[in-house]
Amino acid sequence: MVSATPPAPADGRRVALLTLGCARNEVDSEELAARLHSDGWQVTTDGEGADVVVVNTCGFVEKAKQDSIQTLLAAAETGAKVVAAGCMAERYGRELAESLPEAQAVLSFDDYPDISDRLGAVLAGTAIDAHTPRDRRELLPLTPVRRGEAAVSLPGHGTPAAVAQPGARSAPIEVDEHTPAHLRPVLRRRLDTGPVASLKLASGCDRRCAFCAIPAFRGAFVSRPPEALLAEAEWLARTGVRELVLVSENSSSYGKDLGDPRALEKLLPQLAAVDGIVRVRASYLQPAETRPGLVEAIATTPGVAPYFDLSFQHSSEAVLRRMRRFGSTDRFLELLGSIRALSPEAGARSNFIVGFPGETRADVAELVRFLEEARLDAIGVFDYSDEDGTEAAGLSGKVTTATVKRRYDRLSALADELCAQRAEQRLGSTVQVLVDSVDGGVVEGRAAHQAPEVDGSTTLVAPVGGGVDLTALRPGDLVECTVTATEGVDLVAVPDAMISAAPGVAR
């Protein structure tokens, strides 16, 4: 088995990678870890004792930006050199550098191929000029199928050929004589030893949602080749990963720039067939692009979780039009109905924005109707706020702050109630639970409808009589269980049978 955490060089410079935001950022950090480790750096996720702390920031909404700034300031208090990377750094560049002198450098995605040189310069006291932000959509051809030819840094795309700029050093993962040739280009070093890992399908987005700034700093949509994804999936499995979570800004678009708009339907069974992988989970699906064939592939392919992370954002047709999105309550309910016709117990989650400019009480009532009929397992509610550089910031019909808060509080309370009710509907059902952790006799895992960190979890309790010995379970085991109780969105279940034991684990 390839080690997830190969020993660090004894005399290496020490760098801490702190990751904020989404799972896509986590993949980017693991690419940086691979580059740095191969160049002699000791890589850690603990800022204490580090020579340099790199904060992979999030810049999606105001709260995320504030969290990023606070993390950078806290890192500076350790006495280490501090470097800002990631989305907030890319989005604000020179402006962030001027407003945050505590950071010795603010890096662009274009700096990633030379990350070791950049951090070396920081340690040497050399000033690094921050970049002037630009719309990264303009760096790639307008025609999707020509984007693979462009020499643009795409974080998390996993192979030196995909991300290295002319003259930049490529930095593959540590390999040995037992590493198959097709795995040697994988550019990733795990920072987590758990049984689940994200696999980045693509970067960027071609949609123009009025509230979202992501395409401007992440760029246009670019898919990774299937062969690169399959190689990385195999490499991850060799490090002990059992579940792959497919991430991107819009997974439904995967393959459109490869000349195959149905590429995801073909990729899913191939990923599920990778030795050692017991669950593949798709995420970040765009409802308008979630076609019948994709629904069928996710709902019925063995080894693929029947799980639908659908970005609805609202259900009022009028609000969706102002958001530059498509859909309505009835169309979204029809989509959910088609999913459950194929997989009655399929999981479904979504996020919603309340208080978008022009939203009326009737629009809120329409959203409430949708939520009450949709039977979603997890619901995220966000209160609207203007974001720099977005179309929505200039729209008329702004909802007052007090009204936004009232609507947010109401919808959040409703979401909690509805998700708890949905969990109760699973009482007595059989679920497949992947064990994530065993700590002091407490065994935690997730059923197929529960994605890591965002959708709740399942606690396993000792069976009465037969079943699986709870004390013998280990992270990475896949167990068939019966749901016996709920706690909000979380489940309590009894393990009935081992489906697939984690390989190479002492028992």
UniProtKB/Swiss-Prot annotation:
InterPro entries: Elp3/MiaA/NifB-like_rSAM, Methylthiotransferase_CS, Methylthiotransferase_N, Methylthiotransferase_N_sf, NA-bd_OB-fold, Ribosomal_uS12_MeSTrfase_RimO, rSAM, rSAM_horseshoe. Keywords: 4Fe-4S, Cytoplasm, Iron, Iron-sulfur, Metal-binding, S-adenosyl-L-methionine, Transferase. The keyword 4Fe-4S applies. Residues 424-497 form the TRAM domain. Its cofactor is [4Fe-4S] cluster. GO terms for molecular function: 4 iron, 4 sulfur cluster binding; aspartic acid methylthiotransferase activity; metal ion binding; protein methylthiotransferase activity. Residues 191-422 form the Radical SAM core domain. It holds the Pfam family TRAM_2. It is an enzyme of class 2 (transferase). PROSITE patterns: MTTASE_N, MTTASE_RADICAL, RADICAL_SAM. Binds 2 [4Fe-4S] clusters. One cluster is coordinated with 3 cysteines and an exchangeable S-adenosyl-L-methionine. Residues 13-124 form the MTTase N-terminal domain. One of its GO terms (cellular component) is cytosol. Its EC number is 2.8.4.4. SUPFAM superfamilies: Radical SAM enzymes (SSF102114). It is found in: Cytoplasm. It catalyses: L-aspartate(89)-[ribosomal protein uS12]-hydrogen + (sulfur carrier)-SH + AH2 + 2 S-adenosyl-L-methionine = 3-methylsulfanyl-L-aspartate(89)-[ribosomal protein uS12]-hydrogen + (sulfur carrier)-H + 5'-deoxyadenosine + L-methionine + A + S-adenosyl-L-homocysteine + 2 H(+). [4Fe-4S] cluster 1 binds at C22, C58, C87. Catalyzes the methylthiolation of an aspartic acid residue of ribosomal protein uS12. PANTHER family: RIBOSOMAL PROTEIN S12 METHYLTHIOTRANSFERASE RIMO (PTHR43837), RIBOSOMAL PROTEIN US12 METHYLTHIOTRANSFERASE RIMO (PTHR43837:SF1). Belongs to the methylthiotransferase family. RimO subfamily. This is Ribosomal protein uS12 methylthiotransferase RimO. It comes from Salinispora tropica (strain ATCC BAA-916 / DSM 44818 / JCM 13857 / NBRC 105044 / CNB-440). The gene is rimO.
